[in-house]
Amino acid sequence: MDDIADRMRMDAGEVTLVNHNSVFKTHLLPQTGFPEDQLSLSDQQILSSRQGYLDRSFTCSTRSAAYNPSYYSDNPSSDSFLGSGDLRTFGQSANGQWRNSTPSSSSSLQKSRNSRSLYLETRKTSSGLSNIFAGKSNHHCHVSAYEKSFPIKPVPSPSWSGSCRRSLLSPKKTQRRHVSTAEETVQEEEREIYRQLLQMVTGKQFTIAKPTTHFPLHLSRCLSSSKNTLKDSLFKNGNSCASQIIGSDTSSSGSASILTNQEQLSHSVYSLSSYTPDVVAFGSKDSGTLHHPHHHHSVPHQPDNLAASNTQSEGSDSVILLKVKDSQTPTPSSTFFQAELWIKELTSVYDSRARERLRQIEEQKALALQLQNQRLQEREHSVHDSVELHLRVPLEKEIPVTVAQETQKKGHKLTDSEDEFPEITEEMEKEIKNVFRNGNQDEVLSEAFRLTITRKDIQTLNHLNWLNDEIINFYMNMLMERSKEKGLPSVHAFNTFFFTKLKTAGYQAVKRWTKKVDVFSVDILLVPIHLGVHWCLAVVDFRKKNITYYDSMGGINNEACRILLQYLKQESIDKKRKEFDTNGWQLFSKKSQEIPQQMNGSDCGMFACKYADCITKDRPINFTQQHMPYFRKRMVWEILHRKLL
């Protein structure tokens, strides 16, 4: 028996695991004192074993989980024992990895051994896979005599700290850097937001269109690029996350190939960034041939990163290939935020805004140049007339006439400029400031045209507040009152609710609104149009036979013009008992280049009122956005005194 015991001596391999800067070694060495009656197994086979020395080093990242392959034999033979002096103890750490509490013994002579199977112990996961040793595996293998004789008790590992384990099971999430944004103070930004609000409420399209900024472009694009980067990193790191269980081969060529692959594995370092347990290859029970099922989440196999060998097994042993990936642990190798792309995209956004701003400036310059050319042409005509007068009339008679004519023209121009923008005196300024002070909001400040203006209504003219219906109706009535003066066209202005009622309820709902008014007897009809959050103006000019739509945001609304033309037809039949002659009538919508445009989201009501003011005086529309603060103060004084300046 001593000879048999000497031949049965076996020294198991040593598996080294490098994880979180800690080294755990597993020495699978049986204890001595095996009974003689248990040495004879089925068919009294005495199997010679070959010592397989496997030294695999797996380098794991801080956020990656690691696994420790444990190798043992299902069919131990009588020559797989050591002397009584080589006593080995085994311990199991908290995460399911096996270690040896005693130093490994020196290498012994290698012997051939048949039917040796290698199994992979994996850490217990949430899917129900548990760490099982000594014959109990996930594939329901039977318990061998060797395992019954040499049970291995788990021993808690003091070297495996709880904090390290917690760092593996629940790694700290990477804190994303918050992106700071600059507050937009440019008027074009407010104008763009206001234009988008109008499109949402009215469903109309406006001529000046800019890229929408509901969600910042640089953030959405960076998120999409981060997703692509994450996919690439998972693709690269996933290829190095597989472990294999290699069964022993009875032939010498199979054993040699296993040793060759083991030597290659001993010099390889694998990066396991993230894993989830997933079986990617199964061994046939009879033939041991590897079958590779295709999964939608599996990654392609790279032979440079992982060495694998297809082996055959005898009896009921099976070869299992496991691919382990962790879907819950994020990979730190790829950044979720690329600063360079963000800077480029942010720069492109601001470049587009700058180009839009420059385009608007060019349009305003072109409009100013056009007005200047018109004035120069008028001056040229006046100079031409004066030259002809000099040629016809003697010089001594021409001098006083010319001087009188020039003086009259200069005086007329000064009067026009003073009428268009009269100066607000200090007394007027004090009165206006007094109105804007805090007081009783229901206090009546002005009353006329069967309308009452309170302090609350006047507050809509302060700063950038939106004008309400009472202010606009009161101002339109003042325009009607001024039209009674000599030399001005007669005007009738409809209520601010007229067009909305006409559009929604039809002519029958508004035909009594003109019971005491003959709309065909005036020169101009003013129709304020409210689009929910925006004020516009429609003008019916019976002298020129046209209906024109004015929008300070550049909107086109030919539908409103058609509704008003249809109203004139029905009004003529109802009041005049005859059809309205539409021959020669034209419908227009003023473009943004033809009339002044608002540069914020607050002055649409002021623009509509000032459009009506210029049209009812037969004056060109020559104001701009810069005049709006002046017009607001001026309108306060005009409403308080019920008189236009």
Curated annotation (Swiss-Prot):
Motif (Nuclear localization signal): 171-177, 575-578, 629-635
Chain positions found as Phosphoserine: 57, 117, 157
Gene Ontology annotations for the cellular component aspect, listed alphabetically: cytoplasm; nucleus
Domain of life according to the entry: Eukaryota
Biased composition (Low complexity): 99-117
Active site: 534, 551, 604
GO process annotations (BP): protein desumoylation; proteolysis
Protein location: Nucleus; Cytoplasm
InterPro entries per the UniProt record, alphabetical: Papain-like_cys_pep_sf, Peptidase_C48_C
EC assignment: 3.4.22.-
Disordered: region residues: 92-117, 285-313
Motif position, Nuclear export signal: 636-645
Primary location recorded for the protein, binned into one broad class: nucleus
Protease: annotated segments: 451-614, 451-615
Single GO MF descriptor: SUMO-specific endopeptidase activity
PANTHER family in UniProt: SENTRIN-SPECIFIC PROTEASE 1, SENTRIN/SUMO-SPECIFIC PROTEASE
Its biological purpose: Protease that catalyzes two essential functions in the SUMO pathway. The first is the hydrolysis of an alpha-linked peptide bond at the C-terminal end of the small ubiquitin-like modifier (SUMO) propeptides, SUMO1, SUMO2 and SUMO3 leading to the mature form of the proteins. The second is the deconjugation of SUMO1, SUMO2 and SUMO3 from targeted proteins, by cleaving an epsilon-linked peptide bond between the C-terminal glycine of the mature SUMO and the lysine epsilon-amino group of the target protein. Deconjugates SUMO1 from HIPK2.
Family according to the record: Belongs to the peptidase C48 family.
Subunit structure, as described in the record: Interacts with RBM33; promoting ALKBH5 desumoylation and subsequent activation.
Name of this protein: Sentrin-specific protease 1
